[in-house]
Every structure is written in C-alpha cells, then in structure tokens.
C-alpha cells in the first residue's frame, strides 16, 4: 500500500492565500507549519485549527514586521530568550496541553530612522482590531492605565532621542521592547495577556523599574482586589538579595476578567535554596509537598548547575502570579535551556513527565518535537526550545510550559 498523505487545515488554507510582501510569505511558510503541528499535537479540533491559523494569517502576521530567522542573543530580539520575534509555547498538565502565541507587535516604521522609532503605534492598532473579533475577549481600559505609567509618552520619546546622555544610554539597552502581546488559545476563544517592559520609561523618567512596576500595579487595581498579593510581592522583593531584580509585569486584559497579574524577576545567583524559597513563598502548607516534589523533579531532570550567571548568560526567571483569591501569590520558575542540544532538552523534559507520571506527554514529546522541526538536526543546540517553566495550573496542580522559537 502507498503512504497516506494527511491533508491538514494549514494545507487547505494555504491553497487560497495571497501575501502582501515577502515577509508575510515567510512568516506563513516558516512558522505556520510549526503552529499547525502544535495545534494537532494539543488535540485542537479541526474547526479550531482553521480558526487559529486564520487568525495567525489575517491579523498576527501583519503585526510581526520583517521576517528574520531566530538567532540566540542577537541585539534587538524582543522576547525573553533573545531568540527571535515570535514565541509559541505549549503548556502541559497531567492530562492535557494548550498553546499560546506571543510577540511584540511592530511595523516597518519602528526603526531608528522610521517615524515610530520606539514602536509605540502598532500595539494599540492591533488591540483595536482584535477587540472586534468573535471569540476574543479584550478590555482596553486596563491596557491604557498600564501603558500611561509604563510606556513612553511623546515627551519621553523626545527626551530619549534628543538629549545626548539619554540617547547614548538608549543605545546601550539590550532592546527597545515596551510591550509583548500573548494570546492563549482555549476552546475556540482567545485570551489576551499584555507584558509591560518599563526600561525605557525608567530611563526617561529617572525612576526605578521596581517603583514603576509596583505603582502601576496598584493604579490598575483601583478596587484593591490584588492588594494582598501586591503587598506579599513587595515583601518578597524587599527581602530578596541584590541578584534578584524586578524586570517587567504582565496583566490579563480579558473584558470580563477580574484581573490577575504577574511580576517577573531575574535571578543570577542560582542555588536550590533561593529558587525553592520562591516556590514555597506564601503557599499553604497543605499543598507545598507536591509543589516541592515537582520543582525538585524538574531541577534534577534539567541538571541545573548552581552558581552565578554572568552578564552574557541567561539568568533564571522567577515569577510571582498575583491573584485576588487564595493563594494570593502563585509562583512560576523558568529555566533557560539555550545552549543545550534540542535532543538533550527533549530527553530532560521527557524525564520530568515520566517521573511525574504524565505518561502520554512522556511518550509523545520527542516525536512531537521532530514534527515541529522536521528538517532540523535536533542533536545541535539550535535554540528551538529556549525556556522550560514550572507553574501552578489551578492553584494546586503543577504545569510545565516549554517556549519554542
């Protein structure tokens, strides 16, 4: 018998698409197949695959700007790994998995010589478009409040570009990212989350990043629902060593959502006590045992090396999820795996799944990775899997997220 050619929604849609330019063509043909394979691996229904692939083609690709192949550590890359402009992440739980797409909306005008040198325009335009789509629940009031406090204004831009000292400092920043938009794909709906990076705002205003972040969190939480969580996060930061640095926040901007935020911190002094201390912070004792086991299993599966990370090395990312209900603070720890071969990373993740008893994920992960990147040599360190993060899925049970580029 001959082989069976499986026709996917990606293939069917692609028969009828046209592209405005070569960059749009490249984004669809280079990243569309990866998204398609991941949607299938996560068991999204065929109608949902058509839905999310159409969203990618019609609304996300035009906001991705020039197509570039990921290059780890390249100056100007916008996402956490420094490995590219578009991030696909898959979150695994004991019996399920789901996808998220994250990127910095941009345009060809966002360059040093363009009319939007600090890339301030594309995000608001894209949010306006997405807010009109069926299945996308998006409220812009929180976005505006946070943007006013954490992103550059007209006056800030004028200062940063024209005052010699500030202009020189601006050039030394690793990137000019002010926002990342993440879209979680859930049961035919799209749940948006916005990330705010206030480094340029801090440079223009002279304020500390930490102060900007906490002031913004309290401002957007006008009803005080996150008050307890913000207080606990502030206490953690104040007690942390100088190697722990607040970097940015994210906020869920669903129209009907009561509001939940995350505070992201980098940690360059890597040791078990520091990381496990975060993992236990403000958690009820009744659920700490299983949490601690999951963190230890991941730590050992990745063979994390303790010690200080230098300026040219990736730190560990520690995250405090802030919620209105107990537990008010829910931790997340993200480990960089850039530099390891793709196969070694996959085997480490497989060991975690196996030790946690997540049999289906354990058996399918390596094959899934091969399907995402069928033409790559996975015995090389390619940066395709850049971060592995452990979090709490539903306030008690662990979830593992792998970030792909």
UniProtKB/Swiss-Prot annotation:
InterPro entries: Aro_prenylTrfase_DMATS (IPR017795). Pathway: Alkaloid biosynthesis. It comes from the Eukaryota. Its EC number is 2.5.1.-. Dimethylallyl diphosphate binds at residues 195, 262, 332. One of its GO terms (biological process) is alkaloid metabolic process. It is an enzyme of class 2 (transferase). PANTHER family: INDOLE PRENYLTRANSFERASE TDIB-RELATED (PTHR40627), PRENYLTRANSFERASE ASQH2-RELATED (PTHR40627:SF3). This is Prenyltransferase phqA. The gene is phqA.
């Amino acid at each position: 018998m001959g082989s069976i050619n499986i026709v996917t929604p990606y293939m069917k849609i692609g028969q009828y698409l046209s592209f405005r330019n070569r960059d749009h063509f490249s984004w669809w043909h280079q990243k569309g197949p990866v998204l398609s394979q991941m949607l299938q691996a996560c068991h999204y229904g065929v109608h949902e695959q058509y839905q999310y692939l159409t969203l990618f083609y019609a609304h996300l690709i035009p906001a991705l700007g020039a197509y570039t192949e990921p290059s780890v550590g390249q100056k100007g890359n916008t996402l956490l790994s420094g490995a590219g402009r578009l991030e696909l992440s898959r979150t695994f739980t004991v019996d399920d998995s789901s996808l998220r797409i994250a990127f910095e909306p941009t345009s060809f005008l966002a360059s040093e010589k363009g009319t939007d040198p600090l890339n301030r325009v594309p995000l608001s335009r894209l949010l306006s478009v997405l807010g009109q789509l069926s299945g996308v629940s998006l409220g812009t009031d929180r976005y505006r409040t946070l943007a006013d406090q954490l992103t550059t204004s007209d006056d800030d831009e004028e200062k940063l570009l024209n005052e010699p000292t500030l202009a020189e400092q601006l050039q030394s920043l690793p990137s000019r990212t002010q926002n990342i938009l993440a879209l979680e794909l859930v049961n035919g709906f799209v749940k948006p989350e916005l990330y705010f990076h206030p480094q340029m705002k801090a440079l223009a205003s002279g304020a500390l990043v930490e102060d900007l972040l906490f002031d913004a969190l309290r401002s957007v939480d006008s009803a005080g629902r996150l008050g307890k969580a913000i207080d606990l996060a502030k206490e953690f930061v104040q007690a942390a060593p100088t190697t722990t640095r607040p970097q940015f926040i994210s906020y869920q901007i669903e129209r009907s959502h009561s509001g939940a935020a995350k505070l992201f911190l980098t940690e360059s002094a890597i040791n078990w006590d520091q990381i496990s201390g975060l993992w236990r912070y403000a958690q009820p004792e009744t659920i700490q045992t299983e949490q601690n086991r999951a963190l230890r299993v991941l730590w050992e599966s990745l063979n994390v090396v303790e010690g200080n990370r230098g300026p040219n090395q990736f730190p560990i990312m520690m995250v405090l999820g802030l919620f209105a209900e107990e537990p008010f603070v829910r931790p997340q720890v993200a480990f960089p795996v850039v530099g390891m071969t793709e196969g070694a990373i996959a085997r480490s993740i497989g060991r975690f799944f196996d030790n946690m008893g997540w049999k289906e994920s354990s058996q399918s992960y390596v094959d899934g990775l091969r399907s995402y990147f069928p033409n790559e040599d996975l015995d090389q360190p390619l940066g395709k899997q850049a971060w592995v993060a452990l979090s709490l899925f539903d306030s008690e049970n662990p979830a593992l997220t792998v970030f792909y580029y």
